[in-house]
Every structure is written in C-alpha cells, then in structure tokens.
Amino acid sequence: MFQNYAATYYNPLYDMNQTNFEETKTTGFTNNFEVDWRVIDELRVRGRFGLTKSNEQMKKFRSPFNTEFNSQADIANKGSYEERNTQNLNYDGDFSLTYGKLFNEKHMVNVVGGMRLSQNGSNNSAYKVQGFIDDEFSNPAFALGYQKDGNATYQDSKKRAVSYYLNFGYAYDDRYLLDVNYRSDGSSVFGSDRQFTNTWSVGLGWNIHKEAFFSDIEGISLLKLRASIGNPGNQNFDDYISTRIYTYNTDNMNIFGSSAIVSNLGNRNLEWQKTLDRNIGFDIIFLDNRLRVNFDYFNKRTDPLLVQIGTASSTGVKTLPRNVGKQITEGITLTMNYSIIRREDMFWSVNMNLRHQTSEYKEVSEVLTKYNLDNRNRNLTRYYDGGSPSDLWAVRSCGIDPATGREIFLDKNGEQTFVHNYDDEVVVGNSDPKVEGVIGTSFYYKGFSASINLRYRLGGQIFMQTLYDKVENLSSSKKWENLDKRALYDRWKQPGDQAKFKSIASSEVTPISSRFVEDNNVLSGESISLGYESTAPWLKHIGASSMSVRAYMNDIFRISTVKNERGLSYPFARSVSFSLGVTF
C-alpha cells in the first residue's frame, strides 16, 4: 500500500496474508427401499420409497485488517463473520402394476399403471455479525454486534406433488408400434383452483425393414419411422409462487406486536405451463451396419407461459406471477456414427451430433409492456410478439467517433446520432447458436482404448458484460482501483484515434448498445480419455483376473472468438483424473 496526493493504492495480494476463510461442510444420507413381486409371468407389482436428508453449513470470516475495511473508522464495523445452515429432507415413492404378454405370436401388449408422490422440504437459517478486534479470534462470540439494520434470517419451504399414470403399448408383428401415455399430476406450486392438470402423449412407429417388400433391398439393415405428440407439464418454479405470503415487519412494532406486510401476492388461478410437443423422425442403419443415422424434427408450443409481471408500487410487491402468451420452439437434431474399422482386436469409429432450434413469442399481452420498459437499461431481454426469448435488444452502434471520442448510434431510420434513445432499440443478436453439438472418435486395439469428444458452437452472439462494467462505466473512484488494462490502453485519447472504447476522460454512464455484442463461436475439449485393460497371465499370481488403467480429461481446452474476462465468476474448470481397477 502506498499513497500520493491523489489517492491511496492497495496491493490486492495484501489481503491474501490475512486470516480469511470460507468453508462449506456437507453431510448427507440416502436410503432407497424397493419391493418387486412377480405375481404371474405376465403380471408384476413394484413399490419403491426413497428418503434423502442433507445438511450444509457455510462459514465465512473476513479479517478486520482487510483493505475493504480501511474506510471504516469504528472498530465495530471492521471484520465480519457469516454463517448459513441449510437442511433438506426429501422423499419420494411410487407404486406400479405391469402387465405384458404376446398373443398369437404377433400381438404384443404392455400395460403399466401406477402412482408417484414426492415432497421436497428445505429449512434455511443465516446470520451475520461484525466488529472483530483481532483476526486471531474468529469465533462469532467475539463479535461486537450485528450489522446495522441486519437480523438473522429463517425460511422453511415445502413442495409436494402427486401423479397417477397409465401407459399402454402395442406392437403388431414387430412392424407397427403404438404407445399411449396418460398422467394426472398435482402440485402445490400452482394455484389452489388449478393444482391438478392432465398430460398425455401418443407415439407411432413403423419398422419398414420388417416389411416383406423391403426384404429384397440390400445394404439397409434398419429403417424406422417415428412420430409422437403430447403435452408434458412443467412445475420447475418456486415452491410458493401461487401462494400469498406475509413477512413479519420487526422494524415497526405496535402495542399488538409485530406488523406483517405482503411479500408475495399469489395467484389462486395460476395454471400449469403446458407444452404441446410434436416430433417426427427416422432411424436408419446401412453400409453393412457401419453407419447409423438418427434424425428428429420437433415443434413445441407452450401455452400458457408463466411470467413474473411487474405491478404497481401501491400493491407492496414488485411482481405477480401470471399466465401470459405463448412460445413456439422448433428445430432439428441429427446423430451419426460410422465404424471405420470393425475387427475383433481393433475398432475405430467417428461420431457427431448437431442441434438447431428457434423460438418465437406469440400473443404476448400488453401487460408485459412495463416489464420491457423497466428493463431497458438493465438487460437485453424483451417480450414482444414475433420476438425470440434469446433475442438481444439494444440500440445499434457505429463505434467511436475518431474526432470526438463519443459513441455514434443509429436510430430506427438508419441515421447517425450522438444521442442514445431506447426507442431506437432493435434486435442486434441472438444468444442461441445457429448450430451446436459434439464431434468425436473412439479407438480400441488389443486392450488399448482412446476417445476424444469436442463440443462446438457456431453462430449466436453474447453481451460482453465485463467490457461494459470494467472498461467503461467507471466512476472517478474506480479509476484508481485494479482494472482491466483495456480501460487505460484501448480508450480514445486524442483526435484521430481509431479506438474501440470511448474517451478516457469521459465519466458519463455508457448505455447498452450493440458495441458490446460479439459473435460467440466456441470449440472445447469436452472429454478425452485413454485406457488400457489387461488379462495377462501374471495377474493370476495375485489372484486377479483383469486390470484396467484409465486417464480422463474434461474441458481441457476452450477456443472462442470471444476474448472476455470472467470477472468475479469462477474460471472454466479443467479436470484431469486417473483410475485403477482390479477384478479378483
């Protein structure tokens, strides 16, 4: 640390030598009990019950000597200790009857009926104290008190669900296939008047290669057409999203005790978010079983959507869950696998898959207008008819004016201006890739094995949050802190500079624009493995029959068109592991 007439500078390595710690301890218990009774050859009864309990404790201590507390003159505000405790208790169970029989050697019938129930419970408590005289005493008992206006917190939540289902499958001569599924699901997440919903699906299949007319066609060993339609439900929402919740207001006591305020309005008519899912595809194997291809086209229509809508300030809450509009998603998936070498002692294959999809909003209500207006200067997401959930909305930018160092914008009429106006917002990108998937290869030779899988992402854009926060939008005080070097070297400084970032002398807030949106193409080493398995005679001397050694690497590299700092996020994890297995 050193000082000059302008400011005080801190070495970020100084805090590393202080007594700081953050640790998390987790314990868990899981038990599953299952009963399986085959009453007769065709009838089977199964029951299962599972219980999971876990406890997690987080402790975090910040030394009073850390530089973050240098601005605090009162010792009661220096140093802090935080503790959070979470207890989870979950159970689930199901009961089913299964019947399957082949009639007249051509009619295969399978019927499954049953029910399932579950409960997810969570208990959370936390507190934070401050004021430590010395970092040798990190026990919270040595703290001088709670944070100003800070209290201990406590939350208890439960989510329950129950479902009843009936599945029917029929196959005629292994050529024509039919699957019918029906479910009735209930969940405490949704409104008391709409807690149950019915979901269904129907699937058809045709094994063309089983037909008599196909027997003369050589080179194709399997050809199957598939089609399905159904409406699966979605209950991945907050436990009490539809329930009115009151919070005790301990800051305003009266003669009757503590007051209560509404923290969640709830909605007793809140419906399940339903999706009509349609799919058609085919499977084919040919070239002497060397090439396998699977193709699917899907179309998903979600109606209604479940959206948090902004409310008037007089209600006392910021948002209210409502069912609004529709979303249509369609796309394709393709998987291919080709066996280049296929021998008893050697095998080599290559594989690839890809996915492409687009989404669009339909019949979006005007109630989302306030949401769009409130989020103009916060993010790039908007709800508009015909828009996509992954569209990036911003004002178009022509870059930095070399003469003045100011940003030049394009309005909706295509004219250049120095004035940023949110009414000129247009779609400047889409966060979804044009296509993404995995390409890989597998090799085996006399006990040696190797596999490589690379994940790719082509097309799509990303908002450069680090550039927006750490290179521009810097206050006068932050200019003296440790910053991205581009905040100093890549800014406009004098007339004629061809700079990517605005004038270094400007401290005005930079609005969101397309200047911070870049193409995001990625290639990463998703998984790489090497192994060797041996059944050598010498293993018998130690009583073993086989031995295997393997090495695994996950996300070992990442190549991207985006050069972006991770900020406060964790770096991309690169893991390397080894395993040794011996079979006796």
Predicted regions, residues:
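Surface-exposed extracellular loop regions of Gram-negative outer-membrane beta-barrel proteins
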Residues: 25-104, 159-191, 195-210, 275-277, ...
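Extracellular loop and loop/strand-boundary signature of outer-membrane beta-barrel proteins
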Residues: 16-21, 30, 34, 76-84, ...
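Surface-exposed loop/turn segments flanking beta-strands in extracellular/periplasmic regions
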Residues: 1-15, 60-79, 123-152, 242-266, ...
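Conserved small-residue
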Residues: 126-128, 322, 339-431, 462
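Outer-membrane beta-barrel transmembrane domain signature of Gram-negative proteins
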Residues: 63, 74-175, 229, 241, ...
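Outer-membrane beta-barrel signature, preferentially recognizing the C-terminal barrel domain
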Residues: 17-20, 144-165, 231, 251-292, ...
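C-terminal beta-signal and terminal closure region of outer-membrane beta-barrel proteins
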Residues: 247, 324-331, 372-405, 488-491, ...
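Extracytoplasmic gating/loop element in the C-terminal half of outer-membrane beta-barrel translocons
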Residues: 14, 69, 146, 187, ...
